[in-house]
């Protein structure tokens, strides 16, 4: 789907959601600049696993969103992209309240990009870190 960069900037400016997945999870864009994003979601019991902590897959989702949104600031209108691979390391559980993810483009090439995300809780403690690789699609 073309025009991703424009849709992401529009979502940030209007306080709307850039994709159905981010809308479902309530992920909002707080900051956006070239190669950088800061997103946030509110966590409560409906996002918990059987241990009554935030489900790791949902943490991976906000990390993927932060990195993908950061990458979207670097693409041309003719480009699209997709996640090739992603790794996440969990440092502490998150139970309730806001969770932020900062996405940073570490390296942007012609065909692939590498990005990182740091997830923090309301006390600014690191909850998880992620990194991944994205493939650019053209024509």
Question: What are these regions, as identified by a protein language model?
Answer:
Residues 1-139:
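Terminal targeting signals and extreme-terminal segments of soluble enzymes
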């Amino acid at each position: 789907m073309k025009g991703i960069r424009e849709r992401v900037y529009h979502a940030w400016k209007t306080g709307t959601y850039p994709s159905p997945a981010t809308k479902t999870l309530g992920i909002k864009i707080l900051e956006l600049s070239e190669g950088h994003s800061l997103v946030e979601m509110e966590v409560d019991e409906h996002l918990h696993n059987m241990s009554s902590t935030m489900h790791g897959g949902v943490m991976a989702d906000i990390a993927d969103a932060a990195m993908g949104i950061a990458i979207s600031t670097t693409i041309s209108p003719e480009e699209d992209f997709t996640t090739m691979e992603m790794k996440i390391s969990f440092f502490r559980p998150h139970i309730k309240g806001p969770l932020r993810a900062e996405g940073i483009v570490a390296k942007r090439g012609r065909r692939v990009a590498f990005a990182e995300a740091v997830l923090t809780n309301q006390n600014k403690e690191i909850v998880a870190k992620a990194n991944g690789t994205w493939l650019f699609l053209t024509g």
